[in-house]
Every structure is written in C-alpha cells, then in structure tokens.
Amino acid sequence: MTVPSPRKWGTLVIACLAMLLLAIDLTVLHQAAPKLVEEMRPSAPQFLWIVDVYGFALAGLLVTMGNVGDRIGRKRLLLIGMTAFGAASALTAYAPTPEWLIAARALLGVAGATIMPSTLSMIRNVFTDPRKRTTAVGVWSSVSALGFALGPVVGGALLNSFWWGSVFLVNVPVAVLIVVVGSVVLPESRNPRPGRLDLVSVPLSVVGVVAVVYALKTAAHDGVAGAGVWVAAAAGLVSLVLFTRRQARLAEPLIDVRLFGHRAFSGAIGANVVCIFSMLAASLAFAQYFQLVLGWSPLMSGLAGLPGGLGAAAGGALAAPLVTALGRARVVALGLGLSAAGFVMYGQVDMATGYGYMVAAMIVASIGTGFTFAVTNDTILASVPRERAGAASAIAETAQEMGGALGIAVLGSVLNGAYRNNLRLPAEVPADAADQIRESLGGALETAAALPARLAETVTETARQTFVDSMQMTVMTGAVLLALLAVAALAALRGVPKVIAEVDLDDEGSPQKGSVAAR
C-alpha cells in the first residue's frame, strides 16, 4: 500500500491525538475520585469497580481487538471505537447511579481496546520506510507519555471549576473531531489473508488476562491472604496456558507464539514490561508524596509531575536519530540505565528535598523511559509483517497493562509493607487508631486529625517520615531491576539491525524465510 506523504503524516497526527485522549483518560479518574465519592456515595466495592473495570475491559480485549482490526480494517475499527468512546464518555459524565457508572466505564474500556492497537498498527502500515517508521513510532510514544502526565493537570484544572463528570465530557468533542477528520484522512488497511477468528481463543485470552490483572490489583489493595486472589490467579494462569497451547496448533492464531522465540521481539516485550513495572509503581509513590507528605493540591501535584511527561516526550523524539548513531541495543540499554539513575536520584528524596532536585530526577528517569519505549515499540512492530500489525500492537500493549498491574502489586506491596513494619507510634495512641494509622499514610493523616493536638502532630510527622523512608526503599528496588534489565537488554537485542527491513508474507501467509519474523 502506497500512501501519499501528507496522508501519512495526517495519519500520525490522528493516531497521536487518539492515543493522547486515551492516555489522559487513564489517569484523570484519580483526580475526580474525591468529588465523585462525595456526590454519588458509592459503596466501597462499587468504588473499586468504578476505578478498575475500565482497565479490566481494556486489558482483556486488546489481543482480540488487535486481530479484529487486522481482519475488518484498522481505520474502520478505530472510527467505530472512537464513536463508542465518545458515547461512553457522555454516559460516564452524566451517570446517575454507581451501577450506571460502572457499566459506562466498562464500555469505555471496550472502546479503548479497539483504539489502542489500531493507532499503532496504522502507523506501521502507512510508514513502510523503516527509518520513517522508527521516527513515527517515536513521536507516537512521546505523545503517549505526555498524555499520562497531562491527565492529572487536565483533571485538576477542570475540577477547580466544574463537576466531576467534566473530566469525561471533555472527551466528546475530541472524539467527534477524530471521527470526522479520520474518515477523510485515514487510509484503510487490513490483512488480505486473515483467516478465521478462532472463537475458542477469544474467551481464553479474555479470561486469562482479566483474571491475572484482577489478582494483581486485588493483591496490591488487600494483600495475598484472601482466597479470591489465588483463585483468580490460578484461573488466569490456566486460561493463559491453554490459550498459548492452542495458538501453537492453529494455522491462524490470535498470537503467533513463535515470535517469542525471536530475541528482538521477546527482548523488547520484556524491556517494556519491566520498565512500566517500575515507572507506574514510582508514579503511585510520588503522587502520595506530593499530596500527603508535602500537602500539595491534586492540581499542584499534577503540575509537579509534568516535567516527567515532557522528558519522556523528548526521549521518544530523540530515539530515532540515536538508533542511527548507536544501534537499538545500546539505545535501549542507555534508556534503561538513565531510568535506573533517575530512580537512584529518587532514592535520595526526603521531606526537605527541594523541587528542583525532583525535576532533575524526573527528567533523567523519563528521558530514559522515552528512549526505551520508542525503540522497543518500533522493534516489536518491525518484527512482524504489516498485515499482522494489529495483533503485534495488541501484544505489546497487553504486556504493558500486565506489567503496570504487576508493578503496582509488587512494588506497591513493598512500599506498604515497609511502611507498616517500620512505623513506630507513641504508646498513648489507642489500639484501634494505631491499626488505621498503619494501614496507609492517608489513613494515618485522617486518624491523626482526631487525636489531641500534640499527639496528632507527633503521629503525622512520624507517619510521613516512615512513608518517605519506605518510598526510598521501593524506588531503590526499582533502580536495581532497571539496571539489571539494561544489561539483559544489551545482550538480548545485540545483533538487531539499526534499520529493520520490511517483513513480507509468502504465498501461504507466513513470513518469508530470512526475515526477522521468520527467524
């Protein structure tokens, strides 16, 4: 497929705008949560579903929707998904009950699962020149990173003047713009030999991913003592094992499991998982640091994190020329090494640290993240024929969703466990209050407010200091993981060419011998 240059760059703009909308929406709910709870009064289980159902639907359907896009057309799927996303955003904004809100958020997740793989696979199909493709994927990665940083800022700004639903209603005009312009500008592309969509694989992939993500999120929130965590984890792992075995037998699988035997593909996936694993856990810790330790407002804390998004955007934009100069393995290793260095800098943060130091640490870590994601995403896409770009995009994004959930579960547990175990309270604190104080820093500040003034001041100061100490331990754990991954990535990606040539299918629909995907 030959696409005129203006339409190529128009496609990139629309894909980036769609991804920007999704990235903002992934983080904006946390800003709206306090007002939402105050006005709607959901029960505790309802609130957890309001927060989590979007991610469950999104993660569970990415693989399926990536394959659907390869079959019916990526443009068609994107326009359908964006229309549904706009409608679901309006339903979410005006939800009258918690049950309505949960259903609307689930629909948002389904729509998001159609959009995410469509954006990246369209870029893969219109940018057939390998060097321009690397540049385009770098721009897409930059915009995605910027969107995650903008979410808290946009949410905080809207909530200062409007009701909680405004953070979702703002999606509607952007979705309309994408649908109207995209219907004219976007070229259509699909796999000319898609084969039959295996209807057994679809539920296996959905159950496997959703159950594992549910188990990880539940473990992060409630610990691993409950039977529900283990039942969900077992169900998810069994489903994923059955899914993987079935893919190996199918002529037209949802996921070509042979790709994981290719070092470039599996190495890039692994780098993505561990990088997002560490970054999301650090983001969670520092959101609490800004708001609960320093006492900043949600808007101020969102603005404080903006340099990180800008750094990641800059890293993504610079990745393509760096690949030309250094090669893929070295750029990924450099990115992971910079992220590790940034985490070491994070590990020195205490209650007296100035914001300027925080900005420096954020920029170092986030530029490294930008390098890593831009190169690994391009490597993943380049490892498969463009006819299967939707499936490859879905694999990458599913791995990131699971890596993020795993990071919050594991490093979040390190943070919470260190806080609980190291907190030393004055003897005069009542036992029931002590239990609430040990539960979380937020609970500590709320409980301390009801204690006598002098005792409240002591408890508040102690809880904040213990949290900061625990945060230091958590980010240093992340630094070690990133440093180890930098060494592993250098080995795994060694020999991957700077410019990965186009992968074509033979007459039977398999990657031609000698291509990257066939190795």
Predicted feature descriptions by range:
Residues 2-4, 177-206, 248-266, 324, ...:
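Flexible interhelical linker loops that connect adjacent transmembrane helices
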Residues 52-66, 116-120, 306-318:
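Central cavity-lining transmembrane alpha-helices of secondary-active solute carriers
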Residues 67-200, 352:
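Helix-loop-helix hairpins in multi-pass membrane proteins, especially solute transporters
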Residues 172-190, 208-218, 235-249, 486-493:
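C-terminal membrane-cytosol helix-exit motif in multi-pass small-molecule transporters
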Residues 177, 378-379, 395, 399-494, ...:
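Hydrophobic transmembrane architecture of multi-pass small-molecule transporters
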